[in-house]
A protein has these predicted regions:
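RNA/tRNA-interacting regions in translation and RNA-turnover enzymes
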Residues: 9-11
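A short, glycine/Asx- and small/polar-enriched loop/turn
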Residues: 71-73, 133-138
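Short, low-complexity, polybasic intrinsically disordered segments
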Residues: 93-96, 136-153
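GST superfamily/GST-like fold recognition
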Residues: 119, 126, 130-134
Length: 153
């Protein structure tokens, strides 16, 4: 699973002109399931997302998590995070989980974040979405963990 986290002042996602999710101060998490994602992988990435200290404390240092600051998370599925762009000019998405597996992984990630005490809004899996955000920083972090244990934590 890959999770691209952006610290935001606010963010929203809409499908066909209808807002499906919105947050104020918090995180926008772009999420991509990969084949073989396990509950352990998904849980670890959700915990890391919830606990990553990327918000400033009183001294101006990144020392607080989204939980610490009372922020929310907007989760948006984005299979293009696994794009292979090394060969030719058209990206390949063959490393993305199949749709039904990707949906299950995405839903499990959102459930795990809620289990960490976070309020989560979402986009609509598989839909063409418009995402609006106001970056705070900007501060963007890429988390990637595979079922075989490879990847950053």
């Amino acid at each position: 699973m890959i999770v691209l986290i952006q610290r935001v002042a606010e963010a929203s996602v809409s499908v066909e002109g209808r807002v499906t999710g919105a947050v104020g101060r918090g995180l926008l998490a772009l999420v991509c399931g990969e084949p073989g994602d396990t509950p352990a992988v998904i849980g670890k990435l959700a915990r890391k997302t919830a606990r990553l200290r990327i918000f400033e404390d009183e001294a101006g240092r990144m020392n607080r998590s989204v939980v610490d600051v009372g922020g929310d998370v907007l989760c948006v599925s984005q299979f293009t995070l696994v794009a292979d762009t090394m060969s030719g000019n058209r990206p390949s998405f063959s490393r993305a989980a199949p749709p039904e597996e990707g949906l299950a992984a995405f839903n499990a990630f959102v459930t795990a974040l809620r289990g960490e005490g976070l309020s989560c809004s979402t986009g609509e899996f598989g839909a063409h979405m418009r995402v609006s955000l106001v970056n705070d920083g900007p501060a963007t972090f890429s988390l990637h963990l595979r079922a075989d244990g490879a990847g950053a934590d």
